[in-house]
Amino acid sequence: MSLTYRDAGVDIDEGDRLVDLIKPHARPTLRPEVLGGIGGFGGLFALDVKKYREPVLVSGTDGVGTKLKVAFAADRHDTVGIDLVAMCVNDIAVVGAEPLFFLDYYATGKLSAEQGAEVVKGIAEGCRQAGCALIGGETAELPGFYARGEYDLAGFAVGCVDRPRIVDGTRVARGDVVIGIASSGLHSNGFSLARKALLDRYPLDHRFEGLGGRTLADALLEPTRIYAKDVLALLDQVPVRAFAHITGGGLPGNVPRTLPDGTRAVLEEKRWPRPAIFDVVEREGQVPRDEMYRTFNMGLGLVAVVAPGDEAAAHAALRARGLEAWTVGAIEAGGPGEATCEVVR
């Protein structure tokens, strides 16, 4: 009796079918710099160096974490790809880079072309929002490695910034203004805690008061906001001194990453509204407020630091982009040799 790869759990034909299904999603994301299409050994991108004086490539990689567990339970797979792109492109955008292209890694125990196509549909939508091209990826069918119907995702983004326009926080000074920009919800961090607080006791179709009639699944799977185009538009009008993408570690863990040693950001909690999903997690899980701030973005997905004289212009530029933003604090002198962030309640 002969043995085939399919007998071992890997279906090459299903993989080929997935490629055919995702091409219509990927094709509209392609930029003029892309050479060739999906399916080659490597994605080709001809960087237009004439746009830059000193082009610097910027790369980022990330995943979606256990938010995927919520997608599996809800059997919704068309938005986690947006999360994947957001986690990568937001990281490279905060140094001033324009995202140019994106690649994904999709791994599963038993490949379903339909499920995979839904995931890639979301990835393509994320690339559209970010303005970058989906130029390639990898699909891995790994029998016995994942539970049936489950998968993992990783993403890789590459962008470019002109060296003089790099935003690295070195110009941040005492007295600068901290502006917080609204998140869409939990984004893609803290889901192990959120799931423990909520899903051990409530079904995904439960409707908590304050969530605007949405189910728990709706609130938890709200896609991560992609700030890439907003950051670039703001930089065209305001000399932002620092940005921070608020991910794992929350405000206390991420704001200091972009501040010079000897400074601290002091933020006042009362200055911005918090989406109701955070209150639900805190209340139902009896999570201490400090732990909430160390785990979640608490309503601010992006933070910008500007000089006091640029505060009004920054707010005007953000409003023009349709973003909610608030002046949430200021930069003060801190201890020697370190940068910190404190949230005052």
Swiss-Prot record:
SUPFAM superfamilies: PurM C-terminal domain-like (SSF56042), PurM N-terminal domain-like (SSF55326). InterPro entries: PurM-like_C_dom (IPR010918), PurM-like_C_sf (IPR036676), PurM-like_N (IPR016188), PurM-like_N_sf (IPR036921), PurM_cligase (IPR004733). One of its GO terms (biological process) is 'de novo' IMP biosynthetic process. It is found in: Cytoplasm. One of its GO terms (molecular function) is phosphoribosylformylglycinamidine cyclo-ligase activity. Its EC number is 6.3.3.1. It catalyses: 2-formamido-N(1)-(5-O-phospho-beta-D-ribosyl)acetamidine + ATP = 5-amino-1-(5-phospho-beta-D-ribosyl)imidazole + ADP + phosphate + H(+). The keyword Endoplasmic reticulum does not apply. Disulfide bonds: none annotated. It is an enzyme of class 6 (ligase). PANTHER family: TRIFUNCTIONAL PURINE BIOSYNTHETIC PROTEIN ADENOSINE-3 (PTHR10520:SF12), TRIFUNCTIONAL PURINE BIOSYNTHETIC PROTEIN ADENOSINE-3-RELATED (PTHR10520). This is Phosphoribosylformylglycinamidine cyclo-ligase. It comes from Anaeromyxobacter dehalogenans (strain 2CP-C).
